[in-house]
């Protein structure tokens, strides 16, 4: 889709939304067509790094011990050590609370078996199983990437709605993020954007603005 048309849709969405006393999110809605979504290979399930970032802070939890846990703490990240991890395995309510409070999880690789046993049933269905890293990993690049990442999982639905930024971002920044999502869809399918029936963008409290093909 043409970048100018995407920018025009962002402008229309912005103009149709009344001012609110909070910063509204901007979403992209895509309806798909002519895909057999009973076949897993036709479903969208992936992470996309948005070039303009998210326009907001996200929460990341690190399951680690020793030096990696200390590094995560120095970065201000939520740290879950082995003792706490084992306790979470016995307290499903707390485990769900943790899962909902954090967008991404990172785990020290040698702790993954305990993670699977303690949190797998909670994180798995949410698409939040941790990214495993070695004990001597530098967390900074991964944390920076997660800070620009959104997740899409259509399951068996022929549409998805995904966050692409905040209204405080410029039209060009939002358009670049939308284009990144559309390009990911185009690369996913052999016929590319042919499988996009239509696409819209909207602010939280605003009307949907169509993106012209």
From Swiss-Prot:
Superkingdom of origin: Archaea
InterPro entries in the record: Ribosomal_uL1, Ribosomal_uL1-like, Ribosomal_uL1/biogenesis, Ribosomal_uL1_3-a/b-sand, Ribosomal_uL1_arc, Ribosomal_uL1_CS
Xref: Gene3D superfamilies: 3.30.190.20, 3.40.50.790
Molecular functions (GO terms): rRNA binding; structural constituent of ribosome; tRNA binding
GO biological process, alphabetically ordered: regulation of translation; translation
Signal peptide segment: none
PROSITE patterns: RIBOSOMAL_L1
Keywords: Repressor, Ribonucleoprotein, Ribosomal protein, RNA-binding, rRNA-binding, Translation regulation, tRNA-binding
One annotated Gene Ontology cellular component of this protein: large ribosomal subunit
CDD domains: Ribosomal_L1
Subunit record text: Part of the 50S ribosomal subunit.
Primary role: Binds directly to 23S rRNA. Probably involved in E site tRNA release. Protein L1 is also a translational repressor protein, it controls the translation of its operon by binding to its mRNA.
PANTHER family for this protein: 54S RIBOSOMAL PROTEIN L1, MITOCHONDRIAL, LARGE RIBOSOMAL SUBUNIT PROTEIN UL1M
Family that this chain belongs to: Belongs to the universal ribosomal protein uL1 family.
Protein name: Large ribosomal subunit protein uL1
């Amino acid at each position: 889709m043409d970048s100018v048309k995407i920018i025009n849709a962002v402008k229309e969405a912005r103009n149709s939304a009344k001012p609110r006393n909070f910063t509204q999110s901007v979403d992209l809605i895509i309806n798909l067509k002519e895909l057999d979504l009973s076949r897993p290979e036709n479903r969208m399930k992936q992470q996309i790094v948005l070039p303009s970032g998210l326009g907001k802070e996200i929460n990341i939890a690190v399951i680690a011990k020793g030096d990696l846990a200390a590094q995560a703490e120095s970065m201000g990240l939520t740290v879950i050590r082995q003792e706490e991890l084992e306790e979470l395995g016995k307290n499903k309510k707390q485990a769900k609370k943790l899962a909902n409070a954090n967008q991404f999880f990172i785990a020290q690789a040698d702790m993954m078996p305990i993670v699977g046993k303690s949190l797998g049933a909670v994180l798995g269905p949410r698409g939040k199983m941790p990214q495993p890293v070695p004990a001597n990993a530098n967390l900074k690049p991964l944390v920076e990437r997660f800070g620009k990442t959104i997740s899409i999982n259509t399951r068996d639905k022929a549409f998805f709605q995904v966050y692409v930024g905040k209204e405080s971002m410029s039209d060009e920044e939002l358009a670049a993020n939308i284009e990144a999502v559309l390009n990911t869809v185009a690369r996913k399918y052999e016929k590319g954007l042919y499988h996009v029936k239509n696409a819209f963008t909207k602010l939280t409290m605003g009307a949907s603005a169509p993106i012209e093909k």
